Amino acid sequence: MAVDSFKYVSSLISRYYRLSSARPERPVPWTPLQKPLDQARFSLVTSGGLYHRGHEPPFDMERECAEPTWGDPTFRTIPTDIDQAEVGVSHHHINASGALADVNVLLPVRRFQELAEEGTVGSLAPHAYSFMGYQGFPADLAGWRQIYGPQVAERLLAEAVDCVLLTTA
């Protein structure tokens, strides 16, 4: 099945990438869900720069200020039962007020808990993951591809996750 990588991207960004010389290194992998939604375990991943205040450090904003073309490639683990008061956002490129008022703006944990209670989805994994979406200009994705992406993938497998909802900031 061919996947249109630009379907959900704003037309301006889509036009920029279509006109750029950058091309995908390989086709977008498409993996059909292997079980019905009401039996699937979900996790959530966001590029919103969320962190669990008081439990993990924020993303490295100081280095980004000193090196504006750099972005912190690490990730943070967010418990899906996080209390709103423990939600932190460290991301220079978004307005954090919405997520600070309601985590579901960037990470719809409460909605997925409701969907699990209703039986629409099987369950929500105990952890979600957050990256800081900005990775410099031009973007350096080596850290994501070689270190942090595989680490999150291992954690998702360990939590028996069948499907991930990705949210962008």
Show which residues each predicted segment covers:
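Metallocofactor- and cofactor-centric catalytic cores in central/energy metabolism, strongly enriched
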Residues: 1-169
